[in-house]
Amino acid sequence: MPNVLSDDEELLNGLGSEIMKPSRQGNHMARTVKRWVNKERATTADLKNVNIDGVHGPVNTESYISPGQLYSTDSGNLFHAGRILVVLVGLPATSKTLLSVAITRYTRWLGVRTKSFHFSEYKESAKNIPSDYFCVVPTSKEGVAFVEKLRMQMLNDILAFFNDLSGQLAIYDALNIRKIDRKNLETTFSEIGVKVLFIESIVSDQEIMNRNIALALESNDYKGLSTDEAIDEYMRRLSVNEPYYEMMTHDEELSYIKYINLGKQIIVKDNIHGYLVNKIVFFLMNLRQKKGCVYFARCGTSDKDNYIHDEELNEEGIHYSQVLKDFVLQRIKQKRQAKKNSDSLVEVIDGSHDEDLKTSLIVWTGPRKRTHDTALFFSKEGIKVQQRSELRQLNPGSIADLTDQQIMDKFPSEYKESLKDPYHFRFPRAESYHDLAVRMEPLLLEMEHTSKDILIIAHESTLRVLYGYLMACTCVELPNLNFTRDKLVEISFSPFCNTVELLNIPLTS
Amino acid sequence: MTTSFYDLECKDKKGESFKFDQLKGKVVLIVNVASKCGFTPQYKELEELYKKYQDKGFVILGFPCNQFGKQEPGSDEQITEFCQLNYGVTFPIMKKIDVNGSNADSVYNYLKSQKAGLLGFKGIKWNFEKFLVDSNGKVVQRFSSLTKPSSLDQEIQSLLSK
């Protein structure tokens, strides 16, 4: 029986090395600090208590650690990247808010302390709003003062985020259409060592334009107006700002990305460098407008629910598969019909792009028989089913198929440690949730890339990770999420946040 | 009453009749224009398109309209002078009209009935909305104010080659 080293002993001797005498000098292999700083105690999180994602939640908890985070540092900065300000550039309704929220979700998932600062939110909470506040150069004295005040508030909050809250990535969401505004931002933040990256969003595709304008008209800016009146008002605002729009060019000597027609084309200026910045670029290359939903379902049952054997479905499992297929297809049809009949212009536009289910729904399963066989009824309907190796369940290693009591008996010290940090703990020859999250990242990017409805049939462990990303959960919440067989989880997308709905699968019929 | 594009008629800037049957066999772009609009700089690109394809059978007609934000307040003479002086416009500018409402010009009533615009609405939403008509008199495309004239180059080229 090999000795089990404590954390401190392992750190002193270095991972994988022979045990050395404590008195030995100059051990350069040893890590000088623990891998995780300030772990937080686990608490239970129930799916039903939350139906809006946490992407706008605060990041100022000292002990905050993200699901996909590889390591932590005292300063909070990761990837040797220092601090970064992302500045969005573009006219109204060019998906700037969508971009800022998506980048926030993804980078937070990686562990970067990210926060978006939306001009529209500052305007919402202001008083005595002048009528020309939406102009980049307001005509009235009150308008000029108002816009300047909001800009100063935003700048001060961003500086506080960097300096007081150990923020690493701030996203500035406003028009920023003039060269002088961009130059000022670059100058202000360069002086304090913050790298500035501009992302210009351009929409010239009529279909995307229609949808974006419809979304914009649903904001508070246009409350009380009929749709016709709202469009006129929108065009008036656009008309006022259009003459001031200076598209980004090489001459400005700034780092920028042009994101055109929601990712159909991306132009990256050649002076962009740095691991984290390039990770953002890669993410943008995969980001697309979402029209469908993502659905999560467990697989059907087998006789022994055993990990070691790759079991087939039993009778109950086959029945579940049939019911699941009928329920999912019915739900998607229902939802699309509701879109066509909706009062919301966005929904009507989305509904008008309705397609045959065979081509607009895709089903992903894990590589194991139970998950794939649960999707057989979808295959019979002509719907594409793909086995994804990334959806392989968390590998339990030495504790495979053991009960909690058996784990306690056989691995008492490991069991105790696992309760302290269920997300990161790894049993012998097993994976941790963290390992699972890291290996699933390519799948997350692929989800961002598709605009179809997606149904994912998988083990609970993988569903937790996927849900955790889409709903911006913390790594404390993630291991405690519950996915039961009687529930279909539906996640809907909008530019500002994702929402979840739990649907009862009618298994008793 | 069934109307074809070529049955339409309007007044030119001098108040004289402009019959659309003279447009047969030509590709036509029709734009409601204004002198004090954020999109007014689109005149430059419209003129570039006109110069590039005029010899191949392409025509642009500009219809001044003061219905959106009071951005075309001048007289017909002032409008013509503005276009020529500021943008070197050589394509025809018609007499000022309404494009929406009970006084809407018959040309625009026809165009709006053929193609819906932004968000599916028939009404013209702002200055510099554009209709593209092929050489058979069919309204094939409608573009919002946001669409830059330079991005229409490909469409025009393919219609001219038919």
UniProtKB/Swiss-Prot annotation, chain A:
Q: What is its EC number?
A: 2.7.1.105, 3.1.3.46
GO BP annotations of the record are: fructose 2,6-bisphosphate metabolic process; fructose metabolic process; regulation of glycolytic process
Looking at the UniProt record, the site noted as Transition state stabilizer sits at 298, 459
Q: What is this protein called?
A: Putative 6-phosphofructo-2-kinase/fructose-2,6-bisphosphatase YLR345W
- Record keywords, A-Z: ATP-binding, Cytoplasm, Hydrolase, Kinase, Multifunctional enzyme, Nucleotide-binding, Phosphoprotein, Transferase
Q: Which sequence positions carry the modification called Phosphoserine?
A: 6
Q: Where in the cell is it found?
A: Cytoplasm
Write one Gene Ontology MF term: fructose-2,6-bisphosphate 2-phosphatase activity
A GO term from the CC aspect: cytosol
Swiss-Prot record, chain B:
* Protein's cellular compartments: Cytoplasm; Nucleus; Mitochondrion outer membrane; Mitochondrion inner membrane
Q: Name one GO biological process term.
A: cellular response to oxidative stress
Q: Which InterPro entries match?
A: Glutathione_peroxidase (IPR000889), GPX_AS (IPR029759), GPX_CS (IPR029760), Thioredoxin-like_sf (IPR036249)
**Entry EC no(s):** 1.11.1.24
Query: Any S-S bridges, and between which cysteines?
Result: 37-83
Active-site residues are 37 (cysteine sulfenic acid (-soh) intermediate)
Q: What induces it?
A: By oxidative stress, dependent on transcription factor YAP1. By oleic acid.
Protein name in UniProt? Glutathione peroxidase-like peroxiredoxin 2
Pfam families noted in UniProt: GSHPx
Q: Which reaction does it catalyse?
A: a hydroperoxide + [thioredoxin]-dithiol = an alcohol + [thioredoxin]-disulfide + H2O
Keyword Cytoplasm tagged: yes
Query: How does this polypeptide assemble, per the annotation?
Result: Monomer.
Q: Name one GO molecular function term.
A: glutathione peroxidase activity
Tell me, what does this protein do in biology?
Glutathione peroxidase-like protein that protects cells from phospholipid hydroperoxides and nonphospholipid peroxides during oxidative stress. Plays an important role in the oxidative stress-induced response in the presence of Ca(2+). Has peroxidase activity using preferentially thioredoxin as a reducing power. The redox state of the mitochondrial GPX2 is regulated by TRX1 and TRX2 (cytoplasmic thioredoxin), and by TRX3 (mitochondrial matrix thioredoxin). Involved in sporulation.
Q: Cellular component GO terms, alphabetically?
A: cytoplasm; mitochondrial inner membrane; mitochondrial outer membrane; nucleus
Top-level EC class, please? oxidoreductase
Keyword line = Antioxidant, Cytoplasm, Disulfide bond, Membrane, Mitochondrion, Mitochondrion inner membrane, Mitochondrion outer membrane, Nucleus, Oxidoreductase, Peroxidase, Redox-active center
